[in-house]
Structure formats: structure tokens, C-alpha cells
UniProtKB/Swiss-Prot annotation:
The lineage of its organism: Bacteria, Pseudomonadati, Pseudomonadota, Alphaproteobacteria, Hyphomicrobiales. Keywords: Flavoprotein, FMN, NAD, NADP, Nucleotide-binding, Oxidoreductase. InterPro entries: Flavodoxin/NO_synth, Flavoprotein-like_sf, Flavoprotein_WrbA-like, FMN_Rdtase-like_dom, NQO. The keyword Membrane does not apply. It comes from Brucella canis (strain ATCC 23365 / NCTC 10854 / RM-666). FMN binds at residues 10-15, 78-80, 113-119, 134. This is NAD(P)H dehydrogenase (quinone).
Length: 199
């Protein structure tokens, strides 16, 4: 059975919801899934004053454990068109894994949330994939296999590179049913492709 980690950073709970949906989809695809988050770097008083969602139930991951999984889906909030510093800080601690080639041929996939529809989602998806490529991971994107990302009738999440959601600048918009469905699709797709590669 494929062992998968869904690893996320979420300040306001949007990516937490997307990560849970991706984990559901991966389980539907036959994977054994672990859901974890990266540590918060913002001081607690600042996080509280900014109304961060600090009661997230997912346990904190450690960089060394990434080698224990066949596939890793990273979900991250974005800052100015890049992954949030919390996720970057975590990934910057994986140099030891890189030196040993511990993640070579593992499967990787990415999801992001942005404040606006054009808030750098595709750049953040691709630049996060770069981190995985430096580790020799095999990237499995959302792709246009997920057709529900098409259309302009409503705000839709998704890009060929990975699933996206839009939170609005004040965080008031929650992931839509379509975006959660896309996260489930991506999780299931990654599980099924990983099973073919590592089964």
C-alpha cells in the first residue's frame, strides 16, 4: 500500500481544509495517508492578534520523516507569489535528505491558496515543485485531467500544475465545493499514480 504524507501550512484554515480533502481523495485512491503541518514561525501574540487559526489538530511534521513516504502532497498558503515562509523554512531543513538522495523517485504534488484569483498561485505552485525536483522527486500535477477547473462562470480553483483556492484579502472566502473536489481529485490521482510507480 502506498504511504502518503499530506503536509501543509495554513494560517487561516483554508489550506487545512484543502489538505483534509486531498487526504480523503488519497484514501479513496488506496493510499495510507498521514496528515501533518509545518511549525508556525509567527510569534504567538502576533498570530492571535492577526486571528490565525491556531487550533489545528494535525500534528507537526519533522523534516527527517519525509523519507518515510512514497508520496508527498504539499499544500501551502502563499505570500507575494511564493510559498509561505513557514513551508520554505521547513523545506530548507531537508538538506540532509538531499545529500543522501532520500527523496529520489518519491512522488510529489503541490496545492496553494492565495488572497486573490491572480495572486501568484501558478508561480507558487511551480516554485514549490522546484524544491521537489531538486530532491529528484517525480512531479504529479493536477493536470487538465481535472476538467472542473475549466470555465469562467464562477471563481474556480485549479491550474494544470496543482489545485488552488482563493481566500480574499480578509480571508472571508472559504474553499468552494469545486475547490475541495479538486483537492480530492488531486489526492486520488497522486495515490493511483504512485501505486503504479511503487506498487
Amino acid at each position: 500500500m502506498v504511504k502518503m504524507l499530506v503536509l501543509y501550512y495554513s494560517a487561516y484554515g483554508h489550506m487545512e481544509q484543502m489538505a483534509k480533502a486531498a487526504a480523503e481523495g488519497a484514501r479513496e485512491g488506496g493510499a495510507e495517508v498521514t496528515l501533518k503541518r509545518v511549525p508556525e514561525l509567527v510569534p504567538e501574540e502576533v498570530a492571535k492578534a492577526s486571528h490565525y487559526k491556531i487550533d489545528q489538530e494535525a500534528p507537526i511534521a519533522t523534516p527527517g520523516e519525509l523519507a518515510d513516504y512514497d508520496a508527498i502532497i504539499i499544500g501551502t498558503a502563499t505570500r507575494y507569489g511564493m510559498m509561505a515562509s513557514q513551508m520554505k523554512n521547513f523545506l530548507d531543513q531537508t538538506g540532509g535528505l538531499w545529500a543522501k538522495g532520500a527523496l529520489i523517485n518519491k512522488v510529489g504534488s503541490v496545492m496553494v491558496s492565495t488572497a486573490t484569483q491572480y495572486g501568484g498561485a501558478e508561480l507558487a505552485l511551480i516554485s514549490t515543485q522546484w524544491q521537489m525536483q531538486h530532491h529528484g522527486m517525480i512531479i504529479v500535477p493536477l493536470s487538465y485531467a481535472y476538467r472542473e477547473q475549466m470555465g469562467n462562470d464562477v471563481v474556480r480553483g485549479g491550474a494544470p500544475y496543482g489545485m488552488t483556492t482563493t481566500a480574499d484579502g480578509d480571508g472571508s472566502r472559504q474553499p468552494s465545493a469545486q475547490e475541495l473536489d479538486g483537492a480530492r481529485f488531486q489526492g486520488r490521482r497522486v495515490a493511483e499514480i504512485t501505486a503504479k510507480l511503487h506498487g
